[in-house]
C-alpha cells in the first residue's frame, strides 16, 4: 500500500486504544512505526535494486519482533517514566510489533508480493485483493483520525482544557469518538479487505467458467485488482494454442481486461 495508508493506519490504531500515553508524540510515533518497514527502499541505489529489495526482510514475519523492539526503543516518549499514562516498555514493544504486522498485512493484500517468509523462503505472498492505492481503504482511515481528534477537541474545550491542538498532552484518553474511530479501523484493515478478497475469488470463478464455456485450454489464470477496484479488474491467463507452426511457441500469454461492476457477470 501507499505510505499515506500505512501511516494513517498506525495513527488510527493509536487513537483507537482505550488509553494512550499523554504525549503529543503518541500519534506521530504510531504513524511512523506503521510506515517504517518501507524504509528498506533507502538501501536501494536504483530501480532494479528497489524491485529486488523492497518488501524484503523488513516485511518478514520473523523480523517483526526485532522491528518492534527497535521502534519501541525509538518511541521513548510512550514509556518514559515522567509521561502521564505511560505504557510499559513491553506494552510499547507489543504495540509496535503489531503495527509492523499490520503493515505486512496491508502489503500482502496487493498484487506486488511481500517476502513474508524470509529468511526461510523467497516466495512472495500476494492476495491480489486491493490495488496499490485504494481510496475505499485510505479515506475511512483519514476520516477516523479527523473524527477522533475532533471529538477530543470538543471535549477538551468543554472541560476547559488547553485549546487543541496546542495542548501538550493528550489528556482525553477516552473520548466519545472511540466507536467511530474503531469502526473506521475495523473497516479498513479487516472488513473491506475481506470483501475485496471475496470479490477477487468470485471474479476468478466467473472468469474460469467463462473461459471453460469458450473451450479454451487455460493452464494458469490470475485476476488482479485494477485502478478503482473493486469496480475494475483485469484477468491474465496462460492459454495453449490449438495449432501452431513448428517455430511458434506452444504457449502464449493472453491478457483480458475486464471492466466489472457488481453483480454483473464477468465479461471477457
Residue ranges and their predicted role:
Residues 136, 236, 263:
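Anionic group-transfer/hydrolysis microenvironments
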Residues 258-264:
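Conserved small/polar residues in nucleotide/adenosyl-binding loops
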Residues 19, 241, 264-266:
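A very general structural signal that marks isolated residues within well-ordered alpha-helical segments
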Residues 116, 190, 207, 221, ...:
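Generic structural hydrophobic/aromatic packing signal, biased to beta-strands
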Residues 1-205, 210-217:
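N-terminal membrane-targeting hydrophobic helices
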Residues 172, 266-267:
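Leucine-biased recognition of intrinsically disordered, low-complexity hydrophobic segments
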Residues 219-252:
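Exposed beta-strand-loop-beta-strand "reactive/processing" segments of non-cytosolic proteins
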Amino acid at each position: 500500500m501507499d505510505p499515506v495508508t500505512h501511516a494513517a493506519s498506525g495513527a488510527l490504531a493509536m487513537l483507537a486504544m482505550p488509553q494512550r500515553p499523554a504525549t503529543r508524540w503518541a500519534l506521530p510515533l504510531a504513524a511512523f512505526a506503521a510506515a517504517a518497514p518501507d524504509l528498506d527502499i533507502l538501501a536501494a541505489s536504483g530501480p532494479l535494486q528497489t524491485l529486488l529489495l523492497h518488501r524484503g526482510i523488513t516485511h518478514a514475519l520473523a523480523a517483526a519482533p526485532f522491528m518492534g523492539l527497535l521502534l519501541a526503543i525509538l518511541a521513548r516518549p510512550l514509556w518514559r517514566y515522567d509521561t502521564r499514562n505511560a505504557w510499559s516498555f513491553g506494552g510499547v514493544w507489543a504495540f509496535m510489533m503489531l503495527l509492523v504486522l499490520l503493515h505486512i498485512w496491508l502489503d500482502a493484500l496487493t498484487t506486488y508480493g511481500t517476502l513474508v517468509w524470509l529468511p526461510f523462503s523467497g516466495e512472495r505472498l500476494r492476495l491480489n485483493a486491493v490495488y496499490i492505492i485504494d481510496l475505499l481503504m485510505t479515506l475511512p482511515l483519514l476520516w477516523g483520525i479527523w473524527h477522533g481528534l475532533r471529538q477530543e477537541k470538543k471535549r477538551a474545550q468543554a472541560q476547559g482544557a488547553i485549546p487543541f491542538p496546542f495542548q501538550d498532552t493528550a489528556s482525553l484518553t477516552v473520548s466519545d469518538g472511540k466507536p467511530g474511530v474503531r469502526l473506521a479501523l475495523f473497516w479498513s484493515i479487516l472488513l473491506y479487505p475481506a470483501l475485496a478478497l471475496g470479490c477477487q475469488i468470485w471474479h476468478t470463478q466467473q472468469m474460469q467458467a467463462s473461459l471453460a464455456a469458450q473451450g479454451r485450454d487455460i493452464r494458469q489464470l490470475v485476476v488482479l485488482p485494477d485502478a478503482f477496484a473493486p469496480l475494475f479488474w483485469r484477468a491474465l491467463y496462460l492459454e495453449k494454442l490449438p495449432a501452431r507452426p513448428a517455430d511458434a511457441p506452444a504457449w502464449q500469454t493472453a491478457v483480458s481486461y475486464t471492466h466489472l461492476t457488481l453483480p454483473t457477470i464477468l465479461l471477457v
